[in-house]
Amino acid sequence: MKSPKLAIDPEKLRGAAGKAVSTMKVLANEDRLLLLCQISQGECCVSEIEEQLDIHQPTLSQQLGVLRNEGVVNTRRQGKNIYYSIADPALLEILATLYRLYCPKGNA
């Protein structure tokens, strides 16, 4: 049985390949993927993320730094807290696709 073909123009992809590869590298770390999934639910601060994901603060800070440097999250300071949000709506689509493909339908 043949797999369905996708309508992909290799020349168009060539121009976007660098950005696509950068995005995939960001997502290729379990902690960063979980962080992005949490942030995709709405703007949140470090303490909220730490509580929700049980990722220890040093790891959390390191991975949030990578996300900031790659430009995939926006930051906003309010008092002592820094709030994070997803910078690129396309990333939300990628996260939704990953969730749909890899998370069992019976789980919330």
Language-model-derived ranges and their functions:
Residues 51, 62, 68-69:
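Alpha-helical residues within the helix-turn-helix
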Residues 21-24, 64, 95:
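A generic alpha-helix structural signal
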Residues 1-19, 92-108:
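Amphipathic alpha-helical dimerization/coiled-coil segments
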Residues 11-58, 78, 82-90:
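N-terminal helix-turn-helix DNA-binding core of bacterial DNA-binding proteins
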Residues 3, 58, 63-64, 79:
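Intrinsic disorder/low-complexity segments enriched in polar/small residues
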